[in-house]
Amino acid sequence: MASHNASQTTKAIVAKCLASVRAHPAFDGLVSEVNGAVAVNNIVPSFSGPTEGWVGYHNKMAGYAHSANALRAVYETCVKLGVKFALGSDRGEVTRLVYASSPPSKECVGVETRRGEIYRAKRVILALGAAVGALLPQIGSQITGRCWGIVHIQLTPKEAEELRGIPVTNVLDLAFFFEPDKTTNKLKFCHMGGGFTNFAGSRDGLSLPYPRLADSDFVPLEDDTYIRRLLREALPQFAERPLIDAHLCWFADTADSDYISDYVPGTDSSLVVLSGDSGHGFKMLPILGDFVVDLLTCGSQDNSKWRWKEACMVKEPNAWRGETATQELAGIPRSRS
């Protein structure tokens, strides 16, 4: 969707997305154009705000993934299958890759953790999201660590029930949200846009997440502004409610929003990198493992889009996120909500 105040560029992006899904036979009869408040209210009667001038489309096949529950289910299944996890800041935090000592070989033979413990392996797989450059600086021309701000508002059980089952609502120039969490009754919001980088203090000229999780417990002030504007448009009764549980959500961004799933060149096929989620990769969780198995079985990446690429520094994000430019986190005003 685009709000009535959205630029023509943003509205054109939404129209392009609509044309794309309409052209795919899988969406036949499941996508409808939305133009104005009456159309919005017909789809989501629980929106009490004006939504005047909203334009876009309703895709009945769209949805969301509950990331916390999904990851918990994967973890529990892995444990049952015998996978061993080394967790915690000492046992689980990897500080460097370990390579064979005999040059000129660059064979990766394991990893070392913060407390000095070395885990050895015939093949090492790096799946570190936005932090991948900390262990593999040479990927910096392909991956930029970016983040968006995430906030929540607390609803009562009655308020949450009234919004149960609403469609994922993404107003491209404002923010997106979806139905409240069934356990906490919290409503989650994210203003996407161009995102934010953290190049400050990087020794290798890379944008990386803050080293401590607690350092990311805030959102930029502009996110607060966009989210409250969306609330006034859709759910004005919550527009002044405190924004809680604020944090930055980091992702590994590529120039084309495609993954990097390949062997790292020059490592004798001993090191594999899985990265480039680009802020939209989690929906692939149920099938991503199959792609990795194919890579390990074949010994090379057949999909050219997912190969290791040289000299393709990510500058600005793709248009599907809107037209706002990326900003550097250092020095930006922070929300106090």
Per-region residue spans from a language model:
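General small-molecule cofactor/ligand-binding pocket signal
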Residues: 32-35, 84-88, 242-245
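C-terminal catalytic lobe of FAD-dependent flavoproteins
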Residues: 226-337
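Short, hydrophobic/aromatic-rich segments at coil-to-beta transitions
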Residues: 106-111, 164-168
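Short beta-strand to alpha-helix junction loop
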Residues: 5-12, 57-77, 215-223
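Dinucleotide-binding Rossmann-like beta1-alpha1 core, especially the glycine-rich loop
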Residues: 1-43, 53
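A general structural signal for well-ordered alpha-helical segments in protein cores
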Residues: 11-18, 37, 71, 224-228, ...
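Active-site substrate-recognition segment that forms the wall
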Residues: 119-123, 128-269
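A conserved short coil-to-beta-strand element within the FAD-binding core of flavoproteins
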Residues: 86-109
